[in-house]
Amino acid sequence: MNLHEYQGKQLFAEYGLPVSKGFAVDTPEQAAEACDKIGGSEWVVKAQVHAGGRGKAGGVKLVRSKEDAKAFAAQWLGKNLVTYQTDANGQPVSKILVESCTDIAKELYLGAVVDRSSRRIVFMASTEGGVDIEKVAHETPEKILKATIDPLVGAQPFQGRELAFQLGLEGKQVQQFAKIFVGLAKLFKDHDLALLEVNPLVIKADGDLHCLDAKINIDANAMYRQPKLKTFHDPSQDDAREAHAAKFELNYVALEGNIGCMVNGAGLAMGTMDIVNLHGGKPANFLDVGGGATKERVTEAFKIILSDSNVAAVLVNIFGGIVRCDMIAEGIIGAVKEVGVKVPVVVRLEGNNAELGAKVLAESGLNIIAATSLTDAAQQVVKAAEGK
């Protein structure tokens, strides 16, 4: 689950980290009032969406009057912001963050992720702040500094100081950086985060360090023990199909192809997408129906897949372990009839009673193509999607 910038900064403030004074507002009038509360003569107004690249898309602006802040809020509230990280429809803006202006002398980067290879939290820092860190890592990896956190003792101040020296910080900045480093590490662990970024972490004109942005992603598997963070969830930022799928315990991710995929098991689902690509097709989604491929779940899965107007054919790839393939076939037939599927459906069944399942499909009289293997299924569905 992602958090908005204003929510991330709220957590930063709770851990004593330096952030700008600001208010999240949802009306133009509140934007003007926020300027009065903050004081000063310059403010930064930011559209709140779960996507980067807001500045280049016009979603971040420096304003010098309350009227300009009000106008910015009126421009974006209730509208969709399109950035390089969103699809063509963009993300809806329901909050505007109004905060004090910061004099920036230099921009740095500081972030943390869970490194699966070392099974540790790893911090990354760089002098290349304010830009796409993935681009920096690809083009100049030597500019990415790393510190691995020992789970037994946690982040240590000396690690923060070491990074600070490598970043060229000096004097009071070293201690400030170490405090931010340790605070972020505690926040990361306490809230079961999967990713945390401060981009940029800036050196102000007076030499102090300041967290100018906050990007936080929480591990979805740990949400059951983070009741406070559950209240931070903004459903308007979720893909409607993904949110609907979650209600039925279906793992769905929308993609940009035209071949719908329905599979039981995440690994098999990824393998299915790979082989579709191998044969020249483009998956329209990742969809894992899980271990219980019942008629009800298959029906909902079909509804979700076919809600994408780009889908020209559907590939169903099911491995029958405990569940018999003939029962799965009956479920698929029932779902196709109930939903009224108009596009070709290619089904590959393997496992318990697979032959009987294929026979049931063949005798259904529906537009269902029974494949003999995964390769055959991929070839058949690609042809079907092309209208051949």
From Swiss-Prot:
All residue ranges annotated as the ATP-grasp domain in the record: 9-244
Binding site for substrate: 264, 321-323
Binding locations of Mg(2+): 199, 213
PROSITE patterns: ATP_GRASP, SUCCINYL_COA_LIG_3
Catalytic activity as recorded in UniProt: succinate + ATP + CoA = succinyl-CoA + ADP + phosphate; GTP + succinate + CoA = succinyl-CoA + GDP + phosphate
Enzyme class: ligase
Stretches that traverse the bilayer: none
GO CC entries: cytosol; succinate-CoA ligase complex
Keywords annotated in UniProt: ATP-binding, Ligase, Magnesium, Metal-binding, Nucleotide-binding, Tricarboxylic acid cycle
SUPFAM superfamilies recorded: Glutathione synthetase ATP-binding domain-like (SSF56059), Succinyl-CoA synthetase domains (SSF52210)
Residues the record lists as binding ATP: 46, 53-55, 99, 102, 107
Record GO biological process: succinyl-CoA metabolic process; tricarboxylic acid cycle
Keyword Nucleotide-binding: yes
GO-annotated molecular function: ATP binding; magnesium ion binding; succinate-CoA ligase (ADP-forming) activity; succinate-CoA ligase (GDP-forming) activity
EC number(s) reported in the record: 6.2.1.5
Pathway note: Carbohydrate metabolism; tricarboxylic acid cycle; succinate from succinyl-CoA (ligase route): step 1/1
Subunit architecture: Heterotetramer of two alpha and two beta subunits.
Family: Belongs to the succinate/malate CoA ligase beta subunit family.
Summary of the function given for this chain in its UniProt record: Succinyl-CoA synthetase functions in the citric acid cycle (TCA), coupling the hydrolysis of succinyl-CoA to the synthesis of either ATP or GTP and thus represents the only step of substrate-level phosphorylation in the TCA. The beta subunit provides nucleotide specificity of the enzyme and binds the substrate succinate, while the binding sites for coenzyme A and phosphate are found in the alpha subunit.
Protein name, UniProt field: Succinate--CoA ligase [ADP-forming] subunit beta
Taxonomic placement: Bacteria, Pseudomonadati, Pseudomonadota, Gammaproteobacteria, Pseudomonadales
Gene: sucC
